[in-house]
Amino acid sequence: MSIEVFNESGYDGVNEEMLIDVLSFALGEMDIHPDAEASIHIVDLDTIADLHVKWLDLEGPTDVMSFPMDELTPGYSRPDGATPGPAMLGDIVLCPEFAAKQATKAGHDLAHELALLTVHGSLHLLGYDHVDPAEEREMFALQNELLADWYDNVEARGVTYQPKPSGAGAFPTAADRLELDEKMEADDSGFGGVES
């Protein structure tokens, strides 16, 4: 995988190596061509709020947005799968300031929240969505499976980014995330609405 990270946020404490690792792992598990390209943009609250309005017509900042480019179907390595060449998957945009507040409310650290959001964004790049309840359950289950498997993979490789979290907010269901969104909306921080 060719993954580039552009930190335009000025926010300290973002482990870019970890973001590349988790995205590469998730895309590999989804059988995306190993020469595919993607980028991660780390932005501030104002930038993501502008993108949120421009592309989703929703006011206020959010945690993650994805901008797919080439339409792909996971499974290039399956015997029955097509053999597409490398592709430009698209861009994942993360807002660590928003994610930090969300992580605190969910009961885990920023690094885990950014890893979770990176996996979430990668699934959006691959065409997954959470518009209806069935899609939402499927996407969040896959997100949690990929994230848990990544932690196991990291541990097996002897790499330490942060310990694998536990607790209700660590690997959230769609309902857990909805509850977190409601807490964020009710917060008086001025962050506005949430749409991930």
Curated annotation (Swiss-Prot):
Its main location: cytoplasm. It comes from the Bacteria. InterPro entries: MetalPrtase_cat_dom_sf_prd (IPR023091), YbeY (IPR002036), YbeY_CS (IPR020549). Disulfide bonds: none annotated. One of its GO terms (molecular function) is metalloendopeptidase activity. GO terms for cellular component: cytoplasm. Binds 1 zinc ion. Gene3D superfamilies: Metalloproteases ('zincins'), catalytic domain. Its EC number is 3.1.-.-. Pfam families: YbeY (PF02130). It is an enzyme of class 3 (hydrolase). It is found in: Cytoplasm. GO terms for biological process: rRNA processing. Keywords: Cytoplasm, Endonuclease, Hydrolase, Metal-binding, Nuclease, Ribosome biogenesis, rRNA processing, Zinc. Zn(2+) binds at H120, H124, H130. Its cofactor is Zn(2+). Transmembrane segments: none annotated. SUPFAM superfamilies: Metalloproteases ('zincins'), catalytic domain. NCBIfam families: rRNA maturation RNase YbeY. Single strand-specific metallo-endoribonuclease involved in late-stage 70S ribosome quality control and in maturation of the 3' terminus of the 16S rRNA. Belongs to the endoribonuclease YbeY family. This is Endoribonuclease YbeY. It comes from Corynebacterium glutamicum (strain R). The lineage of its organism: Bacteria, Bacillati, Actinomycetota, Actinomycetes, Mycobacteriales.
